[in-house]
Swiss-Prot record:
Bilayer-crossing regions: none
Recorded superkingdom: Bacteria
Pfam families on file: SufE
Additional notes on this entry: Was identified as a high-confidence drug target.
Keyword Acetylation: yes
InterPro entries referenced in this protein's UniProt entry, alphabetically: Fe-S_metab-assoc_dom
Species per Swiss-Prot/TrEMBL record: Mycobacterium tuberculosis (strain ATCC 25618 / H37Rv)
SUPFAM superfamilies, alphabetized: SufE/NifU
N-acetylthreonine: residues carrying this PTM: T2
Family named by the database record: Belongs to the SufE family.
Identification of the protein by name: Uncharacterized SufE-like protein Rv3284
Cited Gene3D superfamilies: 3.90.1010.10
Entry keywords, A to Z: Acetylation
Length: 143
């Protein structure tokens, strides 16, 4: 399974990683991503970040589009929310430091390519879609 051409290379690589594993191994990979969510930079406080209420667990994001050729994404999610942290980490790994135009071109439902639908509730999967939608909205507002 190859990732759609409209995905930035780092995100396509993440999708490829998920395509290489099956069943419970996909959940293990998601948990690995959860453990790798980058810490917030010292200048960012959760209170200054945008909440994503569509997520079942508390999630906050910050989009820095001051350089549209190198958008910075920051996420905060509690350790007790590994699925949400995993989704945020996938977006951080796949989209941080990518050009705004490339992020805006990512299909809203790219997460279906991860093959998690049989393992994670649709409500939780919509949380990832909501994160991406908010990132895109911030980029459009910055344009």
């Amino acid at each position: 399974m190859t990732a759609p051409a409209s995905l930035p290379a780092p995100l396509a690589e993440v999708v490829s990683d998920f395509a290489e594993v099956q069943g419970q191994d996909k959940l293990r990979l998601l948990l690995e991503f959860a453990n790798e969510l980058p810490a917030l930079p010292s200048h960012l406080a959760e209170s200054a970040m945008e909440p994503v209420p569509e997520c079942q667990s508390p999630l906050f994001l910050h989009v820095d589009a001051s350089d549209p050729n190198r958008v910075r994404l920051h996420f905060s999610a509690p350790a007790e929310a590994p699925t949400t942290r995993g989704f945020a980490s996938i977006l951080a790994a796949g989209l941080d430091e990518q050009p705004a135009a490339d992020i805006l071109a990512v299909p809203e439902d790219f997460y279906t390519e991860l093959g998690l639908a049989a393992l994670i509730s649709p409500l939780r999967l919509r949380g990832m879609s909501a994160m991406l939608a908010r990132i895109k909205r911030r980029l459009r507002e910055a344009d």
